[in-house]
């Protein structure tokens, strides 16, 4: 259950400098957030799917680590990502 290519390229061009800029922390956080939202919807329909729940928790942890890195490196970019994605922290 991955992201469609169109959604992925849309997120990359919105948060990255170019269409191939997938390594930027903002792009990674945005992609993780989209996958988390998709998995959350899946788990609301299938509450007993424990394997997907574990995947969701792993994605949340990855996003948290990238956000902590971004906060440590550049606080302004961190705040902008939180505002753009409506994440609370």
Swiss-Prot record:
Keywords annotated in UniProt: Ribonucleoprotein, Ribosomal protein, RNA-binding, rRNA-binding
Keyword Nucleotide-binding carried by entry: no
Organism: Chlorobaculum parvum (strain DSM 263 / NCIMB 8327)
InterPro entries: Ribosomal_uS15, Ribosomal_uS15_bac-type, uS15_NS1_RNA-bd_sf
Role this protein plays: One of the primary rRNA binding proteins, it binds directly to 16S rRNA where it helps nucleate assembly of the platform of the 30S subunit by binding and bridging several RNA helices of the 16S rRNA. Forms an intersubunit bridge (bridge B4) with the 23S rRNA of the 50S subunit in the ribosome.
Domain of life, per lineage: Bacteria
Family annotation (SUPFAM superfamilies): S15/NS1 RNA-binding domain (SSF47060)
Pfam families assigned: Ribosomal_S15
Protein's name in the database: Small ribosomal subunit protein uS15
Binding partners and assembly: Part of the 30S ribosomal subunit. Forms a bridge to the 50S subunit in the 70S ribosome, contacting the 23S rRNA.
Record-stated family: Belongs to the universal ribosomal protein uS15 family.
Cellular compartments per GO CC: cytosolic small ribosomal subunit
This protein's record includes keyword Ribonucleoprotein: yes
PANTHER family membership: RIBOSOMAL PROTEIN S15, BACTERIAL AND ORGANELLAR (PTHR23321), SMALL RIBOSOMAL SUBUNIT PROTEIN US15M (PTHR23321:SF26)
Gene Ontology terms: biological process: translation
GO molecular function: rRNA binding; structural constituent of ribosome
């Amino acid at each position: 259950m991955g992201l469609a290519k169109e959604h992925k390229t849309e997120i990359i061009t919105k948060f990255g400098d170019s269409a191939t800029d997938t390594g930027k922390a903002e792009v990674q956080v945005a992609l993780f957030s989209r996958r988390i939202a998709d998995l959350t919807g899946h788990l609301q329909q299938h509450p007993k799917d424990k394997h997907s729940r574990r995947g969701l928790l792993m994605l949340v942890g990855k996003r948290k680590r990238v956000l902590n890195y971004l906060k440590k490196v550049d606080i302004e970019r961190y705040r902008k990502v939180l505002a753009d994605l409506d994440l609370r922290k």
